[in-house]
Design a protein with these regions (language model features):
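Bacterial N-terminal signal peptides that target proteins for export
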Residues: 2-13
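Intrinsic-disorder/low-complexity loop/linker signature
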Residues: 49-50, 143, 178, 231
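Short, charged, low-hydrophobicity "junction" segments
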Residues: 72-81, 151-161, 189-196
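Short helix-loop boundary/capping segments
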Residues: 158-241
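Bacterial N-terminal signal peptides
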Residues: 11-21
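N-terminal chloroplast transit peptides
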Residues: 1-3, 21-28
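Amphipathic/hydrophobic helical signal segments and adjacent flexible N-terminal regions
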Residues: 26-101, 105-134, 236, 245-278
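N-terminal glycine/threonine-rich, aromatic-flanked beta-hairpin/loop signature
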Residues: 114-168
């Protein structure tokens, strides 16, 4: 992939994936982010045995499982993949300082690397990224806030074609009173509108670290690694932002016909946490 192509594709994929992560669980606009001024504490990047390593103690995967044949380029896209939601919700606790509504207006790219060409770009580039995100779906008896993934897919319109991001996984890999780091994996498809032909498919793994700032805002560092359909890394990009708190968490008891309060209580009981049922 040429550097010029990398500069077009990576931001587009990042915007789609960030939009998916940002979708608010219950909002009409579907949410996630904002930034004011890029953080001065830039993401530090190095490589180790061919892997991109954030100086967070977290590494990107050296490989991912290949995309199934029916989702690879040349196949016809099945629109049924866009119907319905997650059959099984994955619940995880988040720090109380993360719970709430956050707004982002822009991000700054601080690093990108195309593995095939060897092209590396350490220049900073700020771009608009207007998003609002909700963190927090349910609260347990002790006041702890829990989240789950209600939005497993997102679609972005590009005129003659659209891109689809299908979430495979999202989970916190580290959570303390000072930071939380999420790992997310997506399958991304480019689909021609008229023919429904899949013209490209690839994978993306994102590592996102949130840290509370003294002024009440949120410092966010993001690393997005793109993999080809076979699961081999082809490029990586690092972004930073500051997200502004816009309000408290908007907890959700019901969503698209699902009783989330009951499902959360069942999750707690099934995991020997019945004492936390609200």
């Amino acid at each position: 992939m040429r550097a010029s192509l990398l500069s077009r594709i990576v931001p587009a994929v990042v915007s789609l994936v960030v939009a998916l992560a940002a979708l608010p669980a219950n909002g009409a606009n579907d949410p996630d982010w904002v930034d004011e001024v890029p953080s001065k504490s830039q993401t530090q990047v190095e490589t180790k045995e061919g892997k991109t390593v954030l100086k967070l103690g977290i590494e990107h995967s050296s490989r991912l499982a290949p995309i199934p044949d029916f989702l690879q380029a040349g196949s016809i896209f099945d629109s049924k993949l866009l119907e319905g939601g997650n059959d099984k919700l994955i619940w995880y606790r988040i720090p109380n300082w993360l719970a709430g509504q956050w707004q982002r207006t822009r991000e700054t790219r601080v690093f990108s690397h195309d593995y095939a060409s060897g092209y590396v770009d350490n220049s900073q580039s700020t771009f608009m990224s207007e998003q609002i995100a909700d963190f927090g779906v349910q609260k347990d008896r002790e006041g702890n806030i829990w989240n789950c993934n209600l939005k497993p897919k997102a679609v972005s319109d590009h005129g003659s074609y659209f891109s689809v991001a299908l979430m495979q996984a999202k989970e916190p890999v580290r959570s303390t009173n000072k930071e939380i780091i999420f790992r997310e994996v997506y399958t991304v498809l480019d689909v021609q509108k008229e023919s429904k032909l899949i013209t490209d498919s690839y994978l993306m793994e994102s590592l996102t670290r949130h840290r509370p700032l003294p002024d009440g805002n949120l410092e966010t560092n993001m690393s997005f690694e793109v993999y080809n359909a076979g699961g081999t890394p082809r490029s990586v990009q690092e972004n930073v932002s500051q997200d502004q708190r816009k309000g408290p968490p908007d907890l959700i008891d019901n969503y698209k016909g699902r009783n989330l309060k009951a499902e959360f209580a069942e999750f707690l009981r099934n995991n020997n946490l019945g004492n936390l049922v609200p």
